Curated annotation (Swiss-Prot):
Function: One of the primary rRNA binding proteins. Required for association of the 30S and 50S subunits to form the 70S ribosome, for tRNA binding and peptide bond formation. It has been suggested to have peptidyltransferase activity; this is somewhat controversial. Makes several contacts with the 16S rRNA in the 70S ribosome.
Family: Belongs to the universal ribosomal protein uL2 family.
Quaternary structure and partners: Part of the 50S ribosomal subunit. Forms a bridge to the 30S subunit in the 70S ribosome.
Protein name: Large ribosomal subunit protein uL2
Keyword annotations: Ribonucleoprotein, Ribosomal protein, RNA-binding, rRNA-binding
Organism, scientific name: Gemmatimonas aurantiaca (strain DSM 14586 / JCM 11422 / NBRC 100505 / T-27)
GO biological process: cytoplasmic translation
Length: 276
């Protein structure tokens, strides 16, 4: 896993860099674990834009990922490590002893031919999944459940992980990558280790076209819009504070303070200046 830097034979390639894909062992996905993926173009069921700056991009097929790791006690062998266009992390194809195949997020350090297992009583080893209450303090984990049996929801991007820092009663305290300290029930599953492809953040697109291939459209500043399109539009802003297209002031927290899970946040994440 490394970064391939292009020679500056053109303006676009001067700053372009991509992954060297050294860890990839197969280029075609497992046919039984692939589903069609329809593009929305950022539109909702009324055809209205509900998410800006989305559209176009290369056609993709969805790889069905096992976020639950609920096949307990059955040893699986890592058959292949593959590229997934739908996420920043790589995925690993597991072949279980009973013949079933499943995709999981590729943990850092796992190679083709390694074995993993999930369930209570599993060894604390990279790639194994177990309840958080059985994970030793100081251990890095990823693909963490927030609700028992729902499947992993936290620490799934390339290079991410959370650290087990405390245990008290039924809950385990985790330090997330955002520096947030959060309580998670001890029976929630998590996978030992970090997510692979940690060099993902070092890549540079080099040209606007690369973003378009990924389905990302341009971000237009509010100041260059018309007054009907944005509060900052039309000649000058007039000394107004930076706001969103809907008039919300920059940096205002939008999370509902009465949300039930608010009590599980021991310490909020560190916040920098929001950008518009």
């Amino acid at each position: 896993m490394g970064i391939r830097q292009f020679k500056p034979v053109s303006k676009a390639s001067r700053f372009r860099s991509v992954s060297d894909f050294a860890e990839i062992t197969r280029s075609t996905p497992e046919k039984s674990l692939v589903e069609p993926l329809k593009k929305s173009g950022g539109r909702d069921n009324h055809g209205h834009i509900s998410m800006r700056r989305i559209g176009g991009g290369h056609k993709r097929r969805y790889r069905v990922i096992d976020f639950k790791r609920d096949k307990h006690g059955v040893t699986a062998t890592v058959a292949h490590i593959e590229y997934d266009p739908n996420r920043s992390a790589r995925i690993a194809l597991l072949e279980y002893a009973d013949g079933e195949k499943r995709y999981i997020l590729h943990p850092k350090g796992i190679k083709q031919g390694d074995t993993v297992v999930s369930g209570s009583g599993s060894d604390v080893r990279t790639g194994n999944a177990m309840p958080l209450k059985e994970v030793p303090l100081g251990t890095s984990v990823h693909n963490i459940e927030l609700k028992i049996g729902k499947g992993g929801q936290m620490a799934r991007s390339a290079g991410t992980f959370a650290q087990v820092v405390a245990k008290e009663g039924d809950y385990v305290t985790l330090r997330l990558a955002s520096t947030e300290m959060r309580l998670v029930h001890g029976n929630c599953m998590a996978t030992i280790g970090e997510v692979g492809n940690s060099e993902h953040e070092l890549q540079s697109h080099g040209k606007a076209g690369k973003s378009r291939w990924l389905g990302k459209r341009p971000k237009v500043r509010g100041e260059v819009m018309n007054p009907v399109d944005h509060p900052h539009g039309g000649r000058t802003r007039g000394g107004r504070n930076v706001v969103s297209p809907w008039g919300k002031k920059e940096g205002v927290k939008t999370r509902n303070k009465k949300k039930a899970s608010q009590r599980l946040i021991v310490r909020g994440r560190k916040r920098g200046r929001a950008t518009q």
